[in-house]
Amino acid sequence: MNNEETFYQAMRRQGVTRRSFLKYCSLAATSLGLGAGMAPKIAWALENKPRIPVVWIHGLECTCCTESFIRSAHPLAKDVILSLISLDYDDTLMAAAGTQAEEVFEDIITQYNGKYILAVEGNPPLGEQGMFCISSGRPFIEKLKRAAAGASAIIAWGTCASWGCVQAARPNPTQATPIDKVITDKPIIKVPGCPPIPDVMSAIITYMVTFDRLPDVDRMGRPLMFYGQRIHDKCYRRAHFDAGEFVQSWDDDAARKGYCLYKMGCKGPTTYNACSSTRWNDGVSFPIQSGHGCLGCAENGFWDRGSFYSRVVDIPQMGTHSTADTVGLTALGVVAAAVGVHAVASSVDQRRRHNQQPTETEHQPGNEDKQA
């Protein structure tokens, strides 16, 4: 690919009009939460900056991040791959394989040393000297370190690369390890989720290309624009949570009415992600809207925290409109308040059900005549 070609030149070559290009820039600004006023700056960057070479490598993973990325709609994955960046190496998507693919890998990291972005999907297992994950005939950890050495920045795609995910579940026999525990001398942005939201993945790349830097992150390395609030904060069922209206079983009347799924194990109150605002499948829905509680797949350690259907009792990151950076100091008080709210809500709910039941007097023989 010609990396000196700009994004705008690539789009024009594909027959995209100037008007459509500007509409694309406006949409990109909106998806990044920057407002329409930033569209001209994005347009200037995409008109003048050459496409950035990207090397995308895979460790221990299931490829769900790639599957998610190619379904991006804002912007389209094809626009990102063919125009916005130069995805020169991805052994899942590229046509080449085997020795030919590895020659491309070596050429890119040598020719663009210090200029390319390294995207990592999956994590390196450190057990048995890395032999649990072999890439190109050698342990993946070696490939990761070699690729990271010349990268300008690193994107950790998904919960596997960010936290370890199910591969790191106790007792973690392969010693699966998040990449930031192995690569410590490069800027790393974490985009957790199993998988991450497609449009979030595309937006992160668009931001980096436009502004030549990583987006602002929280103390855990996640971009604040997408991981600054909990799913619970913008969930459309939040009003039912505040009112103490909860689903008690999957087939009860509350479930049919769309009440809060907290008591069914929903991890939305402790999970930072954009599911409730960005949604999935081009904004169609997200798990809670489909009737199932959040699994908390974007959070560190979700795989070792018991059943998906167990109610969250200990909420270490509680805070109504706080980010992960600020909730720690207030978590204890908020947890106590939350316990009180649920106790009151449950009491009110039980009293309401009791009042709806007929009394014993109403069922006594002959009582109908007395009431008449």
UniProtKB/Swiss-Prot annotation:
Cell compartment(s), UniProt: Cell inner membrane
GO biological process: anaerobic respiration
Assigned EC number: 1.12.99.6
Binding site for [4Fe-4S] cluster 1: C62, C65, C160, C194
Membrane topology listed for this record: Single-pass type I membrane protein
Cellular component, GO, one term: [Ni-Fe] hydrogenase complex
Keywords: 3Fe-4S, 4Fe-4S, Cell inner membrane, Cell membrane, Iron, Iron-sulfur, Membrane, Metal-binding, Oxidoreductase, Signal, Transmembrane, Transmembrane helix
Name of the protein: Hydrogenase-1 small chain
Gene that this sequence comes from: hyaA
